[in-house]
Amino acid sequence: MGQYKIWVDADACPNPIKEILFRAAERKSLPLVLVANQMLRVPPSPYISQVRVGSGFDVADQYIVDHVEATHLVITADIPLAAQVIEKGALALNPRGELYTTDNIRQKLTMRDFMEDLRSSGVHTGGPDALSAADKQAFANSLDKWLVRV
């Protein structure tokens, strides 16, 4: 088994969540890799790196899936990516602090597909609420639970 590492699906990850991750990587001396199709601002650190992938549908997701290992954590709001990560034995956590598991991922995929069908038929479903202080705290708490094991 490889070493612990955190991967971030960084194009859509909110900045306050990235800040929490930057602090955690420094505190725990833990590799943190942000994957995006654009250059990101990351603090200078031997633990924090970024991978810039080409633009295109799910290119960053595929990079993460190709490199993730069972000891890794992936931060993503992308449910299909979370499903692939879980299939590889790793953990996936969304930016609101919800851990995707083998028990809940099928339901999440079904709901995502249902909402996508509604949108494609012209129904306006709205987007997610803005990230709240409670969401940030929930994320930090869930991350800390994982970090305790590292």
From Swiss-Prot:
It comes from Shewanella sp. (strain MR-4). CDD domains: PIN_YqxD-like (cd18720). Pfam families: DUF188. This is UPF0178 protein Shewmr4_1560. Belongs to the UPF0178 family.
